[in-house]
Amino acid sequence: MLTERQYKLYKFLKVYAKENNVMPTFREMQQHMNIKSKSGIFNLLFYMEWKGYIKRHPAHKRAIQIIKEYENDNT
């Protein structure tokens, strides 16, 4: 189960990827989430990955893959 903030970022990732065919940058995630630091986004992504919703590839930019659908998500 995702927290409210994690779910907000999850939905943003899904919509952004669908509209742009690429995942957003950290800066775009920061702006959407109104978070000032990269570490705030990093922590959200870390726990989303730990919970099994996304997979990240640290050596590549924008390399986030949604691997698990969120329950009750209509995006």
How would you label these PLM feature ranges?
Residues 52:
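Glycine-centered, phosphate/nucleic-acid-interacting loop/turn motifs that mediate DNA/RNA or nucleotide
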Residues 3-6, 20, 25, 57-75:
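Short, cationic-aromatic polyanion-contact patches
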Residues 8-15:
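Pre-recognition alpha-helix immediately N-terminal to the DNA-recognition helix
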Residues 47-48:
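Basic amphipathic alpha-helical segments that dock to polyanions
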Residues 30:
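The alpha-helix within a helix-turn-helix
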Residues 44:
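Residues within the DNA-recognition helix of helix-turn-helix
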Residues 40-41:
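Helix-turn-helix DNA-binding helix
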